């Protein structure tokens, strides 16, 4: 799922979805939904209630070496403030259970909004593939009901060195919501 910042970033022909007031994923028609799920990627219209600019601004504060958020401790290998020179990557990544402890209130609210979007996507996928609703909790590790694991990551990839950037990888979640602001995503 990605915000349609610019149609040239991922391709002009990706399906587009929006969220209904009841947090249901809506496509123009069933053919577009089928195509989105076959591709495994689609644009999502940014809900008006989502403060994307505030989140981007917060993400920029992580680039300041004096940012207090650079002192967030690591919880294992995947959480906390992490700066990886070999990947030209600076990030603050936290699971839902740590958001209130480390993120400012407006970023916690942003994370909860993204989490609701992720749940909507998960429910749509589970429904689309024919998994009975009574099995959704088990099939999604609880995520379809708002449980399970959710990360809110602020990641900056430094492109000032001219290096190719991040090595090939896969994300560790079932639903990844990206805010793509510059070309470079390879799917």
Locations of regions flagged by a protein language model:
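Peripheral, non-catalytic segments flanking oxidoreductase cores
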Residues: 1-187
């Amino acid at each position: 799922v990605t915000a349609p910042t610019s149609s040239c970033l991922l391709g002009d022909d990706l399906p587009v979805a929006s969220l209904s007031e009841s947090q249901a994923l809506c496509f123009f028609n069933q053919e577009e939904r089928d195509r989105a799920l076959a591709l495994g990627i689609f644009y999502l219209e940014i809900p008006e209630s989502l403060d994307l600019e505030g989140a981007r601004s917060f993400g920029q504060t992580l680039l300041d070496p004096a940012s207090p958020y650079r002192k967030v401790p690591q919880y294992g290998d995947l959480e906390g403030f992490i700066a990886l020179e070999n990947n030209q990557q600076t990030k603050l990544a936290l699971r839902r259970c740590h958001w209130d402890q480390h993120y400012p209130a407006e970023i916690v609210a942003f994370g909860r909004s993204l989490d609701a979007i992720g749940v909507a996507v998960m429910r749509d996928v589970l429904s689309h593939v024919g998994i009975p609703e009574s099995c959704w909790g088990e099939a999604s590790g609880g995520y379809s009901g708002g449980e399970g694991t959710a990360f809110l990551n602020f990641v900056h990839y430094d492109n000032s060195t001219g290096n190719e950037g991040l090595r090939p990888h896969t994300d560790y979640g079932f639903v990844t919501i990206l805010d793509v602001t510059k070309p470079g995503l390879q799917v």
